[in-house]
Amino acid sequence: MDNKKRLAYAIIRFLHDQLRHGELSSDAQESLEVAIQCLETAFGVTVEDSDLALPQTLPEIFEAAAAGKELPPDLRSPQETPPSEEDSAEAERLKTEGNEQMKVENFEAAVHFYGKAIELNPANAVYFCNRAAAYSKLGNYAGAVQDCERAICIDPSYSKAYGRMGLALSSLNKHTEAVAYYRKALELDPDNETYKSNLKVAELRLREAPSPTGGVGSFDIAGLLNNPSFMSMASNLMNNPQVQQLMSGMISGGHNPLGTPGTSPSQNDLASLIQAGQQFAQQMQQQNPELIEQLRSQIRSRTPSASNDDQQE
């Protein structure tokens, strides 16, 4: 593979990371975005070309070179000379032990065993991918992303590495990149239902990214208030004499004209308010079921599924 493209990809990836975490001024961010576009155009490379990824990031390569140190085994490029039979067998044993630790949710121990396996055989993509799963369980999503990148570099056709990369990126709220990796995973494994489901979730989260005038979380209040159907039904609700009477009583200091003997005004207020809300919801469901489904999608808190990816190899 063209090393110039690998280098260009490493630089583009570094610049993308600086955009997200570099705490740069708006002018500096704009300059970086222009630089990224120029590099992508000049070399025909984008940040989604993960098959160009090296086992180590550009800062890691630089730090190791500046310190005059050799990269640790799990950051080196895959060895040209395959490991001995003894090392391969021991690495498999360590991997199996790591899998057992995952089953009992001892994720730190799993990371340890997978790391030992990598030291003996750093050319095995499965070891990196399994450790990525353990890192994700520990909440170390950056470590998971890094290990998935290494697994993909070793085996660009390894669908599970792309799927786990998508999970880690989703957990970091990097939904644009997550979508790209889920699509690649599906390209390699088209019948995988977990990848299909996770792709839909990532695409939904991407669409539901909060707007500047949005409400709490991903609920877009501005969009809702601009919906003619919603505003029409809300207007009808507020013109309902029962609702007007209820609101008038609440505003005037708690006197409830709808009260009944033996029931406190606050209880009647709550019951009437619930009843009015139910009527409004029923009206919305009958007149605009599409809007109801849209609201449900916005309110529903959904997370990607790791069910298929919990299976260690």
Swiss-Prot record:
Q: Name one GO biological process term.
A: ERAD pathway
- Per its UniProt record, what SUPFAM superfamilies does this chain match? TPR-like
Please give the superkingdom of this protein's source: Eukaryota
Modified residues annotated as N6-acetyllysine in this record = 137
Q: What Pfam families does this protein's entry cite?
A: SGTA_dimer, TPR_1, TPR_8
List the GO terms this entry assigns under cellular component, sorted alphabetically: membrane; nucleus; TRC complex
GO molecular function (one) = molecular adaptor activity
What are the protein's UniProt keywords?
A: Acetylation, Chaperone, Cytoplasm, Nucleus, Phosphoprotein, Repeat, TPR repeat
TPR repeat extents: 91-124, 125-158, 159-192
Which InterPro entries does the entry link to? SGT, SGTA_dimer, TPR-like_helical_dom_sf, TPR_rpt
Task: List the Gene3D superfamilies hit by this protein, alphabetically.
Answer: Immunoglobulin FC, subunit C, Tetratricopeptide repeat domain
Q: Where is this region: Disordered?
A: 69-97
Phosphothreonine PTM sites in chain numbering: 81, 303
- Phosphoserine, modified sites: 77, 84, 301, 305
Main localisation: cytoplasm
Localisation = Cytoplasm; Nucleus
Q: Could you say which protein family the record assigns here?
A: Belongs to the SGT family.
The annotated subunit structure for this chain is: Homodimer. Homooligomer. Interacts with DNAJC5 and DNAJC5B. Interacts (via TPR repeats) with HSP90AA1. Interacts (via Gln-rich region) with SLC2A1. Interacts with HSP90AB1. Interacts (via TPR repeats) with HSPA8/Hsc70; the interaction is direct. Interacts with BAG6 (via ubiquitin-like domain); interaction prevents interaction between BAG6 and RNF126. Forms a multiprotein complex, at least composed of DNAJB12, DNAJB14, HSPA8/Hsc70 and SGTA; interaction with DNAJB14 and HSPA8/Hsc70 is direct.
Q: What does this protein do?
A: Co-chaperone that binds misfolded and hydrophobic patches-containing client proteins in the cytosol. Mediates their targeting to the endoplasmic reticulum but also regulates their sorting to the proteasome when targeting fails. Functions in tail-anchored/type II transmembrane proteins membrane insertion constituting with ASNA1 and the BAG6 complex a targeting module. Functions upstream of the BAG6 complex and ASNA1, binding more rapidly the transmembrane domain of newly synthesized proteins.
Query: What name has this protein been given in UniProt?
Result: Small glutamine-rich tetratricopeptide repeat-containing protein alpha
**Gene behind this protein:** SGTA
